[in-house]
Each structure stands twice: as structure tokens, then as C-alpha cells.
Amino acid sequence: MNPSPKTEVELENWRKLNCYNFDSYSINGNFIYEGFGIEKNGSLYVWYYTEKGNKNNLEIFRTESEIIKYAYEKIKSDKWAKTHCVGFNYDKQKTDELLKILTEMKIDYLQDEIPFNKIAYRTFVFGCDINKVMDLPKKYIESPDN
């Protein structure tokens, strides 16, 4: 087993290697609209949360290795950090078709329903399974405007 990351670059590479999404965590400077991140402020490292342009500092660390250990544990324990959306639509039949495909491929998924003007069905796969289904989002993700 690989040792846990000690630097932002190592944490970023670990996320890539394990197919984590980059939507909710800003590690090593990637842009996010909403979520958690690491920022260096002088000699300190700040763990923050940002939403709608408002950034709130949550924790302060003296060393890079301390904040990386903290971030690594947070990311590892966040089931959403490893999800990839492969379906977003309003058609239950189309959603069921997608679930059947994923089941036949023996791919674990998470499916939920959210109110989005009308009921929208979202389907996610985990981690590196996204590499097995790269063609599915083109067919099963609709524009929210539909």
C-alpha cells in the first residue's frame, strides 16, 4: 500500500490516481465553485470552505504535512469526492435504462432524485469506474434547461 500523501502535489496525484473528482476540493490550486480547499497564507496553511464567492477559514495548520494529513482524511471519508455524474435527466425510463446498463457491467452506482423545476434523476459512479463508462454521460446527461 502506498504511504499517505505529504504534500499538495502528492495529494493531487493521489486523487488523480484514484479517480477522485475535482469539483469540490481545491488542492494545489484547482478552481472550484463551491467546496473545501487549501491556501497558503504566509507561513501558515488554511483549510477553507467557499460558496457563492464567500470564503470561510475553518482550520489553520503550521505545516504542509499537517494540513495534507487532515485534507487526505476528509477527502477519503467523503463519498461524494469519488463520485462522477453519468446521468442527469427527467425521464424515469431513460434512468432505468442507464441503471440496467450499470448493473449488467457490475458497476456500483448511486442514484437519487432532486427537485429541479421538476423531478430530476441523477446517477453517479464511483472512482475509476468512470473510465469504463465514458460514453454514457453523452447519452444520459441532459441540459437542466430541457
Where are these regions (language model features)?
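Negatively charged, low-complexity tracts enriched in Asp/Glu with abundant Ser/Thr
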Residues: 1-26, 78, 132-144
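Short, solvent-exposed secondary-structure boundary motifs
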Residues: 17-33, 98-108
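Short, structured interface segments
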Residues: 58-79
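Short amphipathic beta-strand starts and helix->beta connectors
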Residues: 69-73, 103-111
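Short aromatic-glycine-(Arg/Gly/Cys) micro-motifs in beta-strand/loop hairpins
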Residues: 27-56, 74
